[in-house]
Amino acid sequence: MTQVNLLSELNSIASEGRNIDTLDIDTLPTLAILEKINQEDHKVAAAVSAAMADITSGVEAIVSSFNRGGRLVYMGAGTSGRLGILDAVECMPTFSVPEGMVIGLIAGGEKAVIHAVEGAEDDRAMGVADLKALNFSDKDTLVGIAASGRTPYVAAGLEYAKQCKATTIAVNCSPNSVIGQIADIDICAQVGPEVLTGSTRLKSGTAQKLILNMLSTASMIRIGKTYQNLMVDLNASNQKLYARAVRIVMQATDCEEQTAYEALDHANKEVKVAILMILTGVDVQQAREKLAQKQGFLRHAMSQGES
């Protein structure tokens, strides 16, 4: 693409527009600058709310992939890629999902997480190669993230995923975007021009983070990773998380602290198993069998056998 064509394209992208409410921001004192930023941030939640129907469709697609043994793959460049990685890596400790069930890809690879990699976002071949390296298949769901909706790395990945017959989702902040037109599901949070023109790490990045939170969290709830609003599949891999696991067992069962510790010890720190043991009186093996029979849904396992 020539520079003239690129300039023309950028002029048509909502996230690249100038914000008339912040034209004087460089003349303002600190508090007034912060108030301008905060005023713009208030628009983000409403923009995400307006995209709720498409976010719902995205969750349903991800749940379908998980139920078929597939994966959730995030793909982006720069801030968008880092947000995908951030969401992906938190799924293992929060929900004890297997490594590789939720994956974040960033243009330029691991180096690009902390350093800018020149030209990476324009590399269409890399977008395809990164998915091929994962043995991406029709069981998986690809979420392409780009505030502008035009990033070549992401667009190429979405096109390849469609060739694989996988479900594709675009997360962007620009109506009628390139990636939105490629993807099966177009999640577009129309946050408007940024406080600083084109700095999409601001409102656009915040909107993307909220959307990714929804996609992963709702999907995990739908596959039985929670009980009530408790993280009962928490991986108690450090002292803080173990203390949280104890609290979760106590909150779910109304038991004493010592009872929670003992149950977790017998259950090898498996929170669901410990809760089921306390509430139903079964032993460790029976608790695991009940959970397996109900595909890991604690609520269903607790009601098993009741009439």
UniProtKB/Swiss-Prot annotation:
Keywords: Carbohydrate metabolism, Lyase. The active site is at E90 (proton donor), E121. Gene3D superfamilies: 1.10.8.1080, Glucose-6-phosphate isomerase like protein, domain 1. It comes from the Bacteria. SUPFAM superfamilies: SIS domain. GO terms for molecular function: carbohydrate derivative binding; carbon-oxygen lyase activity; ether hydrolase activity. CDD domains: SIS_Etherase. The keyword NAD does not apply. It is an enzyme of class 4 (lyase). Pathway: Amino-sugar metabolism; 1,6-anhydro-N-acetylmuramate degradation; Amino-sugar metabolism; N-acetylmuramate degradation; Cell wall biogenesis; peptidoglycan recycling. It catalyses: N-acetyl-D-muramate 6-phosphate + H2O = N-acetyl-D-glucosamine 6-phosphate + (R)-lactate. Belongs to the GCKR-like family. MurNAc-6-P etherase subfamily. Homodimer. HAMAP family: MurQ. NCBIfam families: N-acetylmuramic acid 6-phosphate etherase, PRK05441.1, PRK12570.1. This is N-acetylmuramic acid 6-phosphate etherase. It comes from Pseudoalteromonas atlantica (strain T6c / ATCC BAA-1087). The lineage of its organism: Bacteria, Pseudomonadati, Pseudomonadota, Gammaproteobacteria, Alteromonadales.
